[in-house]
From Swiss-Prot:
Record-annotated membrane-spanning stretches: none
Name used for this protein in its record: Chalcone synthase 2
Record field: catalytic activity: (E)-4-coumaroyl-CoA + 3 malonyl-CoA + 3 H(+) = 2',4,4',6'-tetrahydroxychalcone + 3 CO2 + 4 CoA
Protein family according to the UniProt entry: Belongs to the thiolase-like superfamily. Chalcone/stilbene synthases family.
Record-listed E.C. numbers: 2.3.1.74
GO terms, biological process: flavonoid biosynthetic process; polyketide biosynthetic process
Pathway in which the depicted protein is active: Secondary metabolite biosynthesis; flavonoid biosynthesis
Catalytic-site annotation from UniProt: C164
Superkingdom, natural source: Eukaryota
Gene that specifies this protein: CHS2
Organism: Pisum sativum
Function: The primary product of this enzyme is 4,2',4',6'-tetrahydroxychalcone (also termed naringenin-chalcone or chalcone) which can under specific conditions spontaneously isomerize into naringenin.
Alphabetized SUPFAM superfamilies for the sequence: Thiolase-like
Amino acid sequence: MVTVSEIRKAQRAEGPATILAIGTANPANCVEQSTYPDFYFKITNSEHKTVLKEKFQRMCDKSMIKRRYMYLTEDILKENPSLCEYMAPSLDARQDMVVVEVPRLGKEAAVKAIKEWGQPKSKITHLIFCTTSGVDMPGADYQLTKLLGLRPYVKRYMMYQQGCFAGGTVFRLAKDLAENNKNARVLVVCSEVTAVTFRGPSDTHLDSLVGQALFGDGAAALIVGSDPVPEIEKPIFEMVWTAQTIAPDSEGAIDGHLREAGLTFHLLKDVPGIVSKNIDKALVEAFKPLGISDYNSIFWIAHPGGPAILDQVEQKLALKPEKMRATREVLSEYGNMSSACVLFILDEMRKKSTQDGLNTTGEGLEWGVLFGFGPGLTIETVVLRSVAI
């Protein structure tokens, strides 16, 4: 008769959780940041608020964003005027959009990841679905299972309403699932649609305007598993260590509340200061066991909450400008896509590393860090190891 410890050992994988594929998707509607203030104030019938528009123009100019992708087109907004007012009851209209669009966009990203993975979708054992865009029962995880035609006994985990740090959370969960379940193949999907947060401008709620200047729509997917099948599965990154912490004295720094008017966001001005003040401690905990204290010697994937956060982290750690290249590139080309951002950055990094003829997926370096920042203020830390190209 086998013992419990023997059963447990047999259930576990041998090697570390490995990212085996990455896929991304965006809505077709591309919005240029340079012309967005004109569009935004026109569609929300706020052109008379000239001083506020000038403030918003400055926010957009300083955002370091060139373009974003949005499900909400001019036609959709004209058909749903309640979304264009500030704090008008509009949750039903928003929910009707996102309960369809979030799984649909997630499917686009997942199909690309599954294609790169090269294995039949019947080998997917677990699904993690993450979104801050609306809620529903059964959830977006269920809808995606149906859209992809996954097996009904895939083990699903639905993450609703976590915010921007959740891009790091999905790595932590996928790592635990892959390493503790032999032969597990975890499909991870983050899908975010700003139809829940779009609203007209307000003179009294400028942090709402910050969100209107930064947020974009996107979905990204990973396939994660331990012990890759030789010749069939091609590792991209290994996940070595993860942590989550709440920054001290940060209550109320980033809040989101789902109300009749949709999802409202509240930001304190000093979010960049809180992040930069706490990042050193997170790095020491993560990299001291590896004997690494030079943070220019690792590759960087940081959630781009906004340019000020990246600037202050760079300054605090004396990082070379190229360390945040992939992060800034994604911010510039897509805006802040909440949880999906760090997956996009990972994809950008491995592609650019190959294009530049570097010898690893992590810009030619072996070790790297992935950070998620969001409500709480919560910080997710993931230590990654690159793979030889």
